[in-house]
Amino acid sequence: SLPTDGAESPWGGAQLTFIARRSQTPDAPQNPQALLAFAAAHPGSVTYPRPPDFTGTAFLEQLLLTLTPQPDALRQPPEEATFAAVTAPLWHYLDRLHPLLWRQGRDFPASPARMDAMLKSGTLRLSITFNPLHAQQKAASGELPKDSYGFGFSEGMLGNVHFVAIPANARATAGAKVVANFLLSPQAQLRKADPTVWGDPSVLDPAKLTEKERQAFNAVVPQDIPPMLGEPHAAWVDALEQEWLRRYGTH
């Protein structure tokens, strides 16, 4: 994660989230070791999108954040001298996980959308998304089974915030600021957070809302969303993807 230094205005949140069906998985895995045990108990029904798909790479980052003994190293660009030591627990974990996956980890779905379809058809027991409200939104539209729900690891899941910015050469900066302010209003944030409308998470601090506004948000937003973990430095994305492809991409 990198600071925006006030150059952008936040307007929506995002977080890596697993999806399951309550009829199949009433007790979701709450940490990487539980996920490994779940995959062992249900071989062939778990997988993740093939990196460099954005969500597939985010899954690697999530595991690295929770498994590495050197999490502070992820706040800086990776260094050649320490990369192997920092990432060793991730590759050890994946070496154990892959034989338990769909097609024994020799093939991976191209996208989260493909995983959603495989969850709906019963091929998979888990899907994955970068929106904690995705399961609600897709269940409401009929694209996922009605009993689909989102979950994450109890210690937290990788997340970020998306922003709007006004170009330096914009011709109507005053009007653009009005729009940016409107997008941060409780009314707009609630509307877009509603899974039947969009399902894009709010960036508002609930403590700064009125009681009526908090109740309105609570009615549409799940209250069991796990804590948000900041993303590693952006340079880790390419480093992890290249190493993943070197290790597993030729299967």
How should each PLM-predicted stretch be described?
Residues A113-T123:
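Short helices/loops that flank or line small-molecule/ion binding pockets
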Residues S1-A113:
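Extracytoplasmic ligand-binding site segments that recognize negatively charged/polar headgroups
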Residues Q33-L36, L60-L64, W91-D95, D116, ...:
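Non-transmembrane alpha-helical segments in soluble domains
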Residues M157-L158, H162-M228:
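Mature extracytoplasmic/periplasmic domains
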Residues L126-P145:
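A ligand-binding cleft/hinge motif common to bilobed small-molecule-binding domains
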Residues A14, Y93-L97, F108, L144-A165:
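Periplasmic-binding protein-like
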Residues A117, P222-H251:
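Conserved C-terminal helix/tail region of periplasmic/extracytoplasmic solute-binding proteins
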Residues H42-S45, S121-L126:
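Alpha-to-beta junction loops
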